[in-house]
UniProtKB/Swiss-Prot annotation:
Pfam families: SecY. Component of the Sec protein translocase complex. Heterotrimer consisting of SecY, SecE and SecG subunits. The heterotrimers can form oligomers, although 1 heterotrimer is thought to be able to translocate proteins. Interacts with the ribosome. Interacts with SecDF, and other proteins may be involved. Interacts with SecA. The keyword Transport applies. One of its GO terms (cellular component) is plasma membrane. PROSITE patterns: SECY_1, SECY_2. GO terms for biological process: intracellular protein transmembrane transport; protein targeting; protein transport by the Sec complex. Keywords: Cell membrane, Membrane, Protein transport, Translocation, Transmembrane, Transmembrane helix, Transport. The gene is secY. The lineage of its organism: Bacteria, Bacillati, Bacillota, Bacilli, Bacillales. This is Protein translocase subunit SecY. The keyword Cell membrane applies. Belongs to the SecY/SEC61-alpha family. The central subunit of the protein translocation channel SecYEG. Consists of two halves formed by TMs 1-5 and 6-10. These two domains form a lateral gate at the front which open onto the bilayer between TMs 2 and 7, and are clamped together by SecE at the back. The channel is closed by both a pore ring composed of hydrophobic SecY resides and a short helix (helix 2A) on the extracellular side of the membrane which forms a plug. The plug probably moves laterally to allow the channel to open. The ring and the pore may move independently. The chain crosses the membrane at residues 18-38, 64-84, 116-136, 146-166, 175-195, 214-234, 262-282, 309-329, 369-389, 390-410.
């Protein structure tokens, strides 16, 4: 590993990408401590046990409870991306047309997503500031008024726009997917505080139950290790489909008559479904705070509270649904079958074309079922465990956080590895 890290530093291009990414993350962390004007941030400390805001605060690296200019984080962008991707499924013909236009279409969709993020972010900023102030008994906003609320909403929206730009810069000039890296950094930044809370609760206040608390912490560590191993296994696992190439096929990637494999990941969607599910389940509750307490908003708060049995089921269902959705965004069976046919390749015992497409689709459905159930279980189990063990509420999203942190780390390592392999260096993973 140390040799691999040394290789990173030797290659100027990779070294510059890593340094650029780190500098952007430093900017992100600094922005998390710049407060929004006209806000008494001390009031928010009383709200840190509320799960809806706790999960947003974790993803933002503490920016929410600081009510900083980056308080909303990147969630409005993720929500906008979900909606735009769903609308591409023959809901909005123009979006569907753009999605089939290659790079040009992707640029148009990306630009529209940016605009939609600004609109969505502004609405969410108004709802969040108004709702937070109501929950704090009017003590959060020091100078309440239409002008103040508009100013706060503009500042928060600008913060989200800045993070969106920052993520794009990391993607273009740094390492990994910029948006995922920002979420990764936010989660990692909050780990010391969570550890400190667990230590204070389990050891400092343990009294004559210290031994029992030690056993509990050991169980927690074993559970974390099991989750880490499980996530790595699922993220790396592939199903190899045997592919044969006809003799005399000039376009095949291997000599005619030989066989190769088409690898399909057990979880081709990665951690994106979890991020999407978090954005989807927190947005309604955040917006509901704008309308105060009534039967409808109380129902929304209950339904989308992932610590409540109903909300837990909704959260798991969202993860499963988004895993299927994004798996077929990442893997296109029709395109795969078409490419194999053009290259003279076929699955033994299966006709090229439609039958090959159906076989790949069937395999992908089964693989995604395993991957989606795994993601849902890992995200939900820690919530149950925390409630049973009486751990701090900040640990409730431990499974979700681990999924994202490990998933993003693996994807980033793969990208760095590919950069090293191109330059004839050996990477992290053995081949």
């Amino acid at each position: 590993m140390f040799k691999t890290i040394s290789n990173f530093m030797r290659v100027k291009d990779i070294r510059n990408k890593i340094i650029f990414t780190l500098l952007m993350l430093i900017v992100f962390r600094l922005g998390s401590f710049i407060p929004v004007p006209h806000v008494n941030t001390e009031v928010l400390k009383a709200q840190d046990q509320m799960s809806v805001f706790g999960i947003l605060n974790t993803f933002g690296g503490g920016a929410l409870f600081n009510f900083s200019i980056l308080a909303m984080g990147i969630m409005p962008y993720i929500t906008a991306s979900i909606i735009i991707q769903l609308l591409q499924m023959d809901v909005v013909p123009k979006f569907t047309e753009w999605s089939k236009q290659g790079e040009v279409g992707r640029r148009k969709l990306a630009q529209f997503t940016r605009y939609f993020t600004i609109v969505l972010g502004f609405i969410q900023a108004l709802g969040m500031s108004y709702g937070f102030n109501n929950m704090a008994g009017g003590a959060l906003i020091t100078d309440p008024g239409v002008g103040t609320y508009l100013l706060i909403a503009i500042v928060l929206t600008a913060g989200t726009a800045f993070l969106m730009w920052l993520g794009e810069q990391i993607t273009s000039h740094g390492v990994g997917n910029g948006i995922s890296i920002i979420i990764f950094a936010g989660i990692v930044a909050g780990i010391p505080q969570t550890i400190n809370q667990i230590y204070a609760q389990q050891f400092v206040d343990a009294g004559d139950q210290l031994f029992l608390q030690i056993i509990k912490v050991v169980v927690i560590l074993v559970a974390i290790l099991a989750i880490v191993v499980g996530v790595i296994f699922i993220q790396q696992a592939v199903r190899k489909i045997s592919i044969q190439y006809a003799k005399g096929s000039g376009r095949s990637p291997v000599p005619g008559g030989q066989s190769t494999h088409l690898p399909l990941k057990v979880n081709p969607a990665g951690v994106i479904p979890v991020i999407f599910a978090v954005a989807f389940i927190t947005t309604p509750r955040t917006v509901a705070t704008f309308f105060g307490s009534n039967d409808v908003t109380n129902w929304i708060q209950k339904t989308f509270d992932y610590t409540h049995p109903v909300g837990m089921g909704v959260y798991a269902a969202l993860i499963i649904a988004f895993t299927y959705f994004y798996a077929f965004v990442q893997v296109n069976p029709e395109q795969m079958a078409d490419n194999l046919k053009k290259q003279g390749g076929y699955i033994p015992g299966v006709r090229p074309g439609k039958m090959t497409q159906d076989r790949i689709t069937s395999i992908l459905y089964r693989l995604t079922f395993v991957g989606s159930i795994f993601l849902a279980v890992i995200a939900i189990l820690p919530v149950l465990f925390v409630n049973i063990a009486g751990l701090p509420s900040s640990a409730q999203i431990g499974g979700t956080s681990l999924l994202i942190v490990i998933g993003v780390a693996l994807e980033t390592m793969k990208q760095l590895e590919s950069q090293l392999v191109k330059r004839n260096y050996r990477g992290f993973m053995k081949h």
